[in-house]
């Protein structure tokens, strides 16, 4: 789905930007926020003993306090860790900042029973930022920034560098159906990242629209799972088969959380439009 960089949260700045009550029930706002900030800084000391579920629990509440209700797009299909974090935050909905901070503090206490927030903190060095507080994410792998000379066609595809990809395909330097180690072709990647125009370019160059990766998933599976309705519609119009199943037996409409996309796929399959000749639909994008 598009794939974002490492999610970083700073422990500085105003909490509860998403809107919190002006008065807390049991603790003053200043006291509660101070304890929350201390807990966020202490996370780096207990991250190694926390389970994945606990880290996700902390992450979601940290984001709820710092940002408020989840306001970012769902991460890409390849970004498993990012999706889990997004889902944990999204599930909180309009959760109150007070409750989120209290639960965050209590969870840190459970991870380290000997720790308790202090009334006043001693001067400290700025901590590294992290998953649910300070520290590099335990679940997210950092992607290196590649030098231009080190990039390959898949890097240009992920970046939506249409000019580079088009030139490589037009000159025959690259096979449009070349696949990576996981069997994912350029069309898989473009669908995953939501690059609609690039998808059109790849289809114009005769990309295999029903190509399956090592998991048996087609570009249509990717576009459906990542919830890009425009790309789903584009693929269907160009002959994508919505009845193909992946290695787990799932069709594209079964891997999406979007009711609209699922309905679109099921309706298309019912009318048999996937048999429409793709050659009649291909046009070079402007």
From Swiss-Prot:
Q: Which UniProt keywords apply?
A: ANK repeat, Cytoplasm, Lipid-binding, Nucleus, Repeat
| Residues binding an acyl-CoA | 59-63, 85, 104
Instruction: State which residue ranges cross the membrane.
Output: none
Phylogenetic lineage: Eukaryota, Metazoa, Chordata, Craniata, Vertebrata
State the InterPro entries in the record: Acyl-CoA-binding_protein, Acyl-CoA-binding_sf, Ankyrin_rpt, Ankyrin_rpt-contain_sf, FERM/acyl-CoA-bd_prot_sf
Q: Which phenotype arises from disrupting this gene? A: CRISP-Cas-mediated knockout results in gastrulation failure due to reduced cell movements. Animals surviving to free-feeding stages have craniofacial abnormalities, decreased head size, structural brain abnormalities, eye abnormalities, and decreased movement. Proteomics analysis shows decreased protein N-myristoylation.
Primary subcellular site in the record, as a coarse category: cytoplasm
The ANK repeats are at 182-211, 215-244
Q: Which cellular component appears as one GO term in the record?
A: cytoplasm
> Can you say what this protein is called?
Acyl-CoA-binding domain-containing protein 6
Q: Where does the protein end up?
A: Cytoplasm; Nucleus
Q: Quote the function comment for this protein.
A: Binds long-chain acyl-coenzyme A molecules with a strong preference for unsaturated C18:1-CoA. Does not bind fatty acids. Plays a role in protein N-myristoylation.
Region labeled Disordered — which residues?
1-24
